[in-house]
Design a protein with these regions (language model features):
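Conserved catalytic-loop aspartate of Hanks-type protein kinases
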Residues: 163
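Activation-segment/catalytic-loop signature of the eukaryotic protein kinase fold
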Residues: 65
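Conserved short submotifs of the Hanks-type protein kinase catalytic core
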Residues: 69-82
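Activation segment signature within eukaryotic-like protein kinase domains
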Residues: 98-99
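Protein kinase catalytic-loop region centered on the HRD/HxD motif
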Residues: 104-114
Length: 376
């Protein structure tokens, strides 16, 4: 919980059904993303523990996890980028090239025994270099319904096969600018899944071409068809074998579209410029400040320490003042009282073993002279 206790400020970014996400600043002025789950929500801690040990290119690092104020949380790197949800539709070459990068990141995760489980446009960010970064993981539920594999609706755990389906739905959104599956409820989306097929997907894209909503050619529709067949099958067994096979299909499709030459380089440059423009616009927006309860804990402790030190100093000053008053403030003490006090001190001193070189004074004569004469 070291990072959480070091947060000095927070700004609200997004509220979902399971958690709120904040942009937070640490004591070292470093920026983090803080995902604070709602009360009663729990996640798969074993997946988070594995992810904290990994540093995979193209995957946002998880730095800390735990619970604060009775609610689970995750701290991860803040990605200065734009959600792919804001960047669709995108050029087909950019979409195919970017999906290959995501597949490479997912393959690295599979090597550690991890499936993503919640691949959707909002969980893929593009940084300033136009490189995709995978965010978040499906550690709570089936993930975004429009991008979840049918078996996830039945409670199946995330797997390589379910990630393949989600990648197909993601690719469709990237090139079409709209979700493949229509519907607002669980039943509606599940019903749309049962009617999926490469032909229907192709017709859907053709309608968008005719409506001039997307810039695709008939050749583009043809090179995409094997991907729809391999990814968007309702049955896991009918999908591609694994991520490696998907990467091969993406490479073939990219070559048919023009390869990784000048055309793709120009498209990526324009895409990066688009990202920069959105980020510049976002910089002018002021995020809503969030007063997270534990942000003040450090401040309160510092204030508490300052108050303690102030109180201690004040107490010492009062004690010193009282001592000074006792020993130096008895200006109205009577002569008799003064004499008695001096006499008592003299007797006390004489009873102590004093050094031979010191002669103790006899104050009796002085005291006799200090006594007032009768009648005064």
């Amino acid at each position: 919980m070291e990072l959480v206790r070091s947060f000095t400020s927070a700004s609200f970014i997004h509220q979902g059904g399971e958690a709120c996400i904040y942009k937070v600043q640490g004591e070292s002025s470093r920026t983090y993303s803080f995902k604070w789950y709602n009360a009663g929500v729990s996640y798969d801690a074993s997946v988070i523990e594995k992810l904290q040990k990994l540093n995979v290119p193209g995957v946002c690092r998880i730095l800390e996890s735990g619970a604060v104020e009775g609610r689970p949380y995750i701290v991860y790197d803040y990605v200065d980028g734009v959600s792919s949800k804001e960047l669709s539709p995108m050029p087909l070459g950019v979409a195919l090239h970017s999906l290959r990068k995501i597949v490479a990141a997912l393959q690295a995760l599979r090597g550690a025994g991890i499936s993503h489980g919640d691949i959707n446009p909002s969980n893929v960010f593009f940084d300033r270099s136009a490189s995709p970064v995978l965010m978040d993981f499906g550690i709570v539920g089936p993930g975004a319904l429009h991008y979840s594999a049918p078996e996830r609706f039945s409670g199946a755990a995330p797997s390589e096969k379910s990630d393949l389906f989600s990648l197909g739905a993601l690719l469709y959104f990237w090139v079409a600018g709209e979700p493949l599956l229509e519907g607002e409820t669980f039943e509606q989306i599940r019903g749309a899944m049962e009617n999926l097929g490469p032909e229907k997907i192709g017709l859907s894209l053709l309608e968008k071409i005719q409506a001039k909503k997307v810039s695709l050619s008939p050749e583009d529709l043809s090179l995409l068809e094997p991907l729809w067949k391999g990814l968007l099958e309702p049955s896991p067994d009918a999908r591609l074998e694994d991520l490696e096979e998907l990467d091969e299909l993406l490479e073939i499709a990219l070559e048919k579209h023009g390869g990784v030459g000048v055309q793709l380089a120009r498209a990526l440059e324009n895409f990066g410029q688009r990202i920069s423009e959105i980020l510049q616009k976002n910089e002018t927006k002021t995020l809503e400040k969030a007063d997270l309860p534990f942000l003040n804990s450090g401040k309160r402790s510092k204030k508490g320490k300052k108050g303690f030190y102030f109180g201690a100093c004040l107490f010492i000053l009062i004690v010193l003042a009282l001592v000074a008053l006792v020993f130096f403030g008895r200006s109205e003490t009577s002569v008799d009282e003064t004499g008695a006090l001096l006499m008592q001190k003299t007797r006390d001193s004489q009873m102590q073993a004093a050094p031979d070189s010191v002669e103790m004074p006899n104050l009796e004569g002085v005291l006799e002279r200090l006594k007032p004469e009768e009648g005064e």
